Curated annotation (Swiss-Prot):
<keyword id="KW-0378">Hydrolase</keyword>
<dbReference type="GO" id="GO:0006508">
    <property type="term" value="P:proteolysis"/>
</dbReference>
<feature type="transmembrane region" description="Helical">
    <location>
        <begin position="4"/>
        <end position="24"/>
    </location>
</feature>
<keyword id="KW-0645">Protease</keyword>
<keyword id="KW-0997">Cell inner membrane</keyword>
<keyword id="KW-0472">Membrane</keyword>
<feature type="binding site">
    <location>
        <position position="145"/>
    </location>
    <ligand>
        <name>Zn(2+)</name>
    </ligand>
</feature>
<comment type="similarity">
    <text>Belongs to the peptidase M48B family.</text>
</comment>
<dbReference type="Pfam" id="PF01435">
    <property type="entry name" value="Peptidase_M48"/>
</dbReference>
<dbReference type="GO" id="GO:0004222">
    <property type="term" value="F:metalloendopeptidase activity"/>
</dbReference>
<feature type="binding site">
    <location>
        <position position="223"/>
    </location>
    <ligand>
        <name>Zn(2+)</name>
    </ligand>
</feature>
<feature type="transmembrane region" description="Helical">
    <location>
        <begin position="160"/>
        <end position="180"/>
    </location>
</feature>
<protein>
    <recommendedName>
        <fullName>Protease HtpX</fullName>
        <ecNumber>3.4.24.-</ecNumber>
    </recommendedName>
</protein>
<keyword id="KW-0812">Transmembrane</keyword>
<dbReference type="InterPro" id="IPR050083">
    <property type="entry name" value="HtpX_protease"/>
</dbReference>
<keyword id="KW-0346">Stress response</keyword>
<dbReference type="GO" id="GO:0005886">
    <property type="term" value="C:plasma membrane"/>
</dbReference>
Length: 298
């Protein structure tokens, strides 16, 4: 129920921002009588596409805390929390970013994630399962991986890519709906018919599935960079050890908006093209093939 509420709130915010922005920019209707104004349509698609992506990014820390129940460590209550905060602080300084918020959330399975709108206003969260089942040097490497995601600007880059993808999904879906409605079925009434709306929804779903291959491909590439950064911040052998440990465990499930920035993910049921993370063995191989002077963060 909580996730449904968060989803509805996000969409209400997206629509509000989109409508206000379109009014400010003077973007009119993309339907001119029975014809399609491609310029206005593209502007409409871009505003909606980027608004959705960046509103989600802006709300990502709040959504993360709400969806997994992450508790930010404001004042460390024990030695473990003190170590977590100090480790992230040291890694953030080495990576040249502002100190992220550090949080812990209840989860039997091992995982961690990073989120936030900017490099200097981010969140790093770890599950209790990760702390329970991993050695300290392995946890340090996982934290380094997440700090590297922040330092590399992966959240903003992913939001930009998602905005571009959203734009083209909306744009081409409405063109397909227009062609089916006006050209194939020869509907000449003004405005959107039921056919247009149904075809538009179906086309957006289909194009969205195809477009997700692009975002997942990008996510897999960024994982190698985050592993590299984690090795730079916490040590190459520690990063390899953490990934090897994950090979023996079932990774925890994360909400969709954070899955791309977790340390690991469950395999996709529909093939590698839809995986947000490369197979762990490939990540380990890539690290082993990397020399010490190739380790870095952005």
């Amino acid at each position: 129920m909580k996730r449904i509420g968060l989803f509805l709130l996000t969409n209400i915010a997206v629509l509000a921002v989109a409508m206000i922005t379109m009014n400010l920019l003077g973007v009119g209707s993309y339907m001119q009588g029975t014809s399609l104004d491609l310029g206005n349509l593209f502007a409409f698609a871009a505003i909606i596409g980027f608004a959705g992506s960046f509103v989600s990014l802006a709300m990502s820390k709040w959504l993360a805390k709400m969806s997994v129940g992450a508790k930010v460590i404001k004042e460390p209550r024990n030695a473990d929390e003190q170590w977590l905060v100090e480790t992230v602080r040291r890694q953030a300084e080495k990576a040249g970013i502002g100190m992220p918020e550090v949080a812990i959330y209840e989860g039997a399975e091992p995982n961690a994630f990073a989120t936030g709108m900017t490099k200097n206003s981010a969140l790093v969260a770890v599950s209790t399962g990760l702390l329970r089942h991993m050695r300290q040097n392995e946890v340090e490497a996982v934290l380094g991986h997440e700090v590297a995601h922040i330092a590399n600007g992966d959240m903003v880059t992913m939001a930009l890519l998602q905005g571009v993808v959203n734009t083209f999904v909306i744009f081409f879906a409405k063109i397909v709906a227009y062609v089916v409605d006006r050209v194939v079925l020869k509907n000449e009434s003004e405005g959107h018919s039921i056919t247009f709306i149904v075809v538009d929804i179906v086309a957006q779903i289909l194009f969205g599935i195809l477009a997700s291959m692009i975002t997942m491909w990008f996510s897999r590439k960024r994982e190698f960079h985050a592993d590299n950064g984690g090795a730079y911040l916490a040590g190459k052998e520690n990063m390899i050890a953490a990934l090897q440990r994950l090979q023996t465990m079932q990774p925890g499930e994360l909400p969709d908006q954070m899955a791309a920035f977790g340390i690991s993910a469950r395999p996709s049921n529909i093939g590698d093209l839809f995986r947000s993370h490369p197979p762990l063995e490939k990540r380990i191989e890539a690290l082993r093939a990397t020399t010490q002077d190739q380790l870095k963060v952005a």
